[in-house]
């Protein structure tokens, strides 16, 4: 995937929001590397909110209500879950700098978590950034089958109900494509982003 990278040693929360507003997002090479770099993909992944697809099997699982779904009650714990190695993710880019920046955005009302709980146990979740009428999905994790998928369904329901226009997934995967994620060229993405960012900040 072609992308633009540029090192950025000292990122503030306000700088991070500005970066999102123009199509950039930060990453680190590893959890142990304190440096961040900006990423600007030439091809961007989005999930069109009006074309979100839920498979029959997942819809059936959701109807069984296997988890208690909560919003913004354990943001730091969700980030920690996303930072843990998984079979499809042996390493993580979530370093201490990322944790602290997104915790600050959460305190500012611009970063949010969707959580799947079994009793008192957090078993899956996702987090991302809201700005204007755009939501930028960052990462997700599961400790039970289907937990992150069910969180994504609840995220989309919430975004639709609040009037969000853009769900940015940064890149696409086969997993996300099963929900309707598509690749769009940078120029097309910038048009969608500008429209969503022109909106006042929507309540999540």
From Swiss-Prot:
EC numbers: 2.3.2.6
* Compartments where found: Cytoplasm
One biological process term in Gene Ontology: protein catabolic process
- Does the keyword tRNA processing feature in the UniProt annotation? no
| Keyword Signal attributed | no
Please describe what this protein does: Functions in the N-end rule pathway of protein degradation where it conjugates Leu, Phe and, less efficiently, Met from aminoacyl-tRNAs to the N-termini of proteins containing an N-terminal arginine or lysine.
Protein's recorded name: Leucyl/phenylalanyl-tRNA--protein transferase
- State the gene name recorded for this protein: aat
